Amino acid sequence: MENVTDTVFRRIVATCGSPDVFFTEFTRVEQVAAFPRRGLPGRMRSTDIERPLVVQIWGTSPELYLRSARIIADLGFAGIDINMGCPVRKIRNKGSCSGLIARPALAAEIIAATREGAVSTDGQHLPVSVKTRIGIERPVVDEWLGFLLAQGIDVLTVHGRTALQESEGPCDYDTIARAVQLRNNIAPDTLVFANGDIRTRAEGSAVCTQTGCDGAMIGRGIFSDPYLFAAGRSPQDGQEPNRSFSEQSAAEKVALMTRHIHLHRDEWKGTRNYEVMKRFYKIYLVGFPGAEELRDRLNHTYDYEHALREIADFPVPG
């Protein structure tokens, strides 16, 4: 998720309870292909605690996908994910991301180029996955998902809405179940992951049971509980005890938020706008007296230091 799943927030989530695999923010192939001349794209920054980490890329040039895949393959990442699902209109109208649903020939070229490039110099093959939606204006499950499954990808992640729906209306899990049926007939070795309206590990497990898919990708659900991946797991070294976020005290929630502010400031050093931090305050400031007031105060701050002063001056319950 753009300006959400950066290296800083992944570190926060990892200390609360890591998922099985992280994905980066989606990164333009033009930026990846410019490495090392222009340095590593900020969206690909990472630390060891965030691994395994898959790089999600997007664009329309097969040649740049090929070059990007070769670069990623030698940087220690766990895989390459091609974004064919972002519904943002200005991106879609340029034929990128979900716009590729209407351009299957180009989508096939992109996948082939990425697979060709996803081999490290020591001969290791990186998995190549595609994240997509069930259509643009209407579902075209058999035509589109069946087509993708025939391209030799390792994983297909299906968001059960059309591009025009964006996040509106319920996620159609029946279409994901149909994707599993298509997989069984077309590409039995390809994994199918479900995406959309999954807010907890339990919901992810239920969707897997309902659809027959192999896994679940959680996106916006992390906004309701940074600890959601820890549920049902035993604590691991360096991780917090396995309690849901709703069980944390006000002081614990504010301490985690304060750590996030410090990390964001120190990592990006002004290269990302402070305003980005404000979308995270709603995660932490819930479920205790004064949470709404503090959230309102922080939403009116103008930089990191201003936010930290407001927190220091606020009487947070114990």
Residue ranges and their predicted role:
Residues 1, 27-29, 58-60, 85-87, ...:
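Active-site beta-loop-alpha junctions enriched in small/polar residues
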Residues 1-74:
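Glycine-rich, positively charged N-terminal anion/phosphate-binding segment
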Residues 2, 8, 112, 116-117, ...:
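Alpha/beta catalytic cores of nucleotide-metabolism and tRNA/nucleoside-modifying enzymes
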Residues 19-36, 98-103, 107, 122, ...:
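Glycine-rich, aromatic-flanked loop segments that form ligand/cofactor-binding clefts
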Residues 22-24, 53-57, 80, 128-132, ...:
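Hydrophobic faces of well-ordered beta-strands that scaffold small-molecule active sites
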Residues 32-34, 166, 225-231:
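Short, charged, surface-exposed secondary-structure boundary motifs
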